[in-house]
């Protein structure tokens, strides 16, 4: 589907992206680590985890391992060598949680992942259950010396990425903020900090009063008015009230422009729960239209990528989002076909496992909801911070770490099926996006278990090298980025599809069965000459993978191929075999 005048950034089409959950990637500066007892958060004091390799605990949100921006900088050469073109970071702004989807200050990078230059004040005493005397936290997160130093370090990260020809997308959470936010100040962090206005929780005279929807508004409700609207009822996630505050909208649009402009020069936004913003569809669409104008005016080449479940079409008409995180037309159909598992590992459906009709039907249905330029840069992930890791899904264990134990996430996994999924990912329309550690063999049930640390020093080198080779293949061939796609053949646990443009033609064949399969497929309808040769450029299997060239012959428009169990092959039409039909 094409909308006249709607374009998405060329660099984002088929770009290889890499998602980093910063606290769990690499600790490059231990001096900025959250300290045990630094502040009180959701029922307990926060805790610093000293063992980098310890599995996350059930209430992981207030436990910190120490990953930071310096750690990302330290590993940029690794990411560049892997073939990554775009780094997508989960939220980096000041926030009390490790996931940082509860923003405290949109103007600054959190010094706990940035730089702490002034570090004074006491930690909480054992048993203290509020933040009135969280002086160390107050110093770290409100002192301008720390905030500005953290922004400078972020600028360095962006410069180092751009120096390597790489880009960065950051996470924007504009539907809600956090209860620690300076506009609300429920935790009284800012009440005794210099240079800040009074928060709306504290006083009805706060300049931020209308940034939130309070259900009780009598004068005697303050100080301490906790009747504000929370996203899905969560009082730690106050919903922002765009309907009643033009100042709020203007401020957030200013933030949208600020971070994609000099000196920060971010290359795009990932928008959290973007369809939930506002209290009506009308307000939602109006806001995102203004957001697009603001971002594209500041940086026409910035991408706007939204988290979205369901039909995105009404936001993808050229005047709101560029694209979305691709659940319906990538993660879910591939997970069902290859594993039979739901993306949280909450359910197994035998009727979906290996079902080519369901797979093709789902893909056709959901892909038609995209504009072509949106589909080409849709974020195609196998895993992320909200769902179980794909490698764990290959063991078909239904449940979560709380019931099954964290060790169960790594038992009975099938790396060959993971490789099949990566072949899909690197040859399917969209921007293939790795979740940190997937390439190294990391496992995990749904959150928080999927937020384990990167296994530095104990990587699965077979998987790592396989990812590197598949990324290379993806980047070397434009057909995988912007070419056409056509289904060729489907049987139980067996699929073939074609990717092609005017210059190149590929077949991708997958056997997801536990036994070897020999299949004769009619392939000429996808533009292949009836007599031609195809050359193997990748073969993945249970024992590893191979890029050794192997020739297959198409005779009478048919390809006869044998694939071992749990294997995939990428075949390219030899240039000597005749012209490829036009797109």
Each predicted region: which residue ranges?
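Conserved, mostly hydrophobic/aromatic
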Residues: 20, 79, 89, 106, ...
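Flexible loop/turn segments at secondary-structure boundaries
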Residues: 26-28, 94-97, 176-179, 218-222, ...
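Conserved alpha/beta catalytic core and glycan-binding cleft of carbohydrate-active enzymes
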Residues: 180-185, 256, 263, 288, ...
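Carbohydrate-interacting/catalytic domains
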Residues: 1-21, 27, 33-36, 42-43, ...
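Short, flexible loop/turn elements at secondary-structure junctions
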Residues: 21-26, 93, 110-113, 174, ...
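Substrate-binding/active-site clefts of carbohydrate-active enzymes
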Residues: 22-85, 92-263, 291, 297, ...
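Active-site cleft segment of glycoside hydrolase catalytic domains centered on the general acid/base Glu
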Residues: 238-246, 273-292
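Hydrophobic faces of well-ordered beta-strands that scaffold small-molecule active sites
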Residues: 16-18, 87-89, 168-170, 269, ...
